[in-house]
Amino acid sequence: MIRKQARERREYLYRKSLELQESSLTEKRQQLKAALASGKPLSKELAEDKELQKDFIYDESEQTEIDDEYSALSGISEPKVLITTSRNPSVKLLQFSKEIKLMFPNSIKLNRGNYVITDLVATCQRVQISDLIILHEHRGIPTSLTISHFPHGPSIIFTLHNVKLRHDLPEIGNSSESYPHLVFENFTSELGKRVVKIMKHLFPPGVKKDSSRVITFINNDDFISVRHHMYVKTKDTVELSEVGPRFEMRLYELRLGLLDNKDSEVEWQLRRFIRTGNRKNYLG
């Protein structure tokens, strides 16, 4: 009987302590929500509370399969990519768009004509396009590449640098239509992994092991070098032949919506006019 009473008392005290801890944590959570709603700074006690830090992780939000815009495409279905240009393109931009089409298997090239963005997005939704790529230029030089994923985003904008077309490269090789192997190097941050996911889902899955085609994306100080090669195995070595095009990309903006939604949330944007704007590496 004495042992039973002692056990019951310990259990009661334990439950009581849990209730007190839970009520204290609930009160702190309410204080935290009130501070967030009003915009007031957190008290030192709330800011340093480890239990609350487990509940509210603001720097790296947890991603689930429901949040993943590419879960339907991942390794199952082939992407359907539409490539177009800005209106009234120059000869060089048209040629660049043709060479970009050769990089993405099963892609479609569309002459822009008088299409505005809203009509272009509506057309892509109607024919079940998975990704839309738009190339822009300034005075005949390709300057930006925009990718918008359907049906609900994201949309990503890269600036283009040092664009070399196939005829600008020495000893150019012949391009193949086989599915390419993809190489991504030095994309170690969460933003870098996000960029990799967007880029790799432009290419179809199911690459054969004996495919001799390789497309490489190498991040160096947030400039992504894009190279397109064919390789041939000899007795002792592997010989690479560049087939082009060759260019560098720099991430400018990442939005959560489609191109026609001007009010979509900006997930990330390059801001150069801050103290660390040109010194910090964001992709890796």
UniProtKB/Swiss-Prot annotation:
Coiled coil: none annotated. PROSITE patterns: BRIX. Pfam families: Brix. It is found in: Nucleus, Nucleolus. One of its GO terms (biological process) is rRNA processing. Residues 79-260 form the Brix domain. One of its GO terms (molecular function) is RNA folding chaperone. Component of the U3 small nucleolar ribonucleoprotein. Required for the early cleavages at sites A0, A1 and A2 during 18S ribosomal pre-RNA processing. This is U3 small nucleolar ribonucleoprotein protein IMP4. It comes from Debaryomyces hansenii (strain ATCC 36239 / CBS 767 / BCRC 21394 / JCM 1990 / NBRC 0083 / IGC 2968).
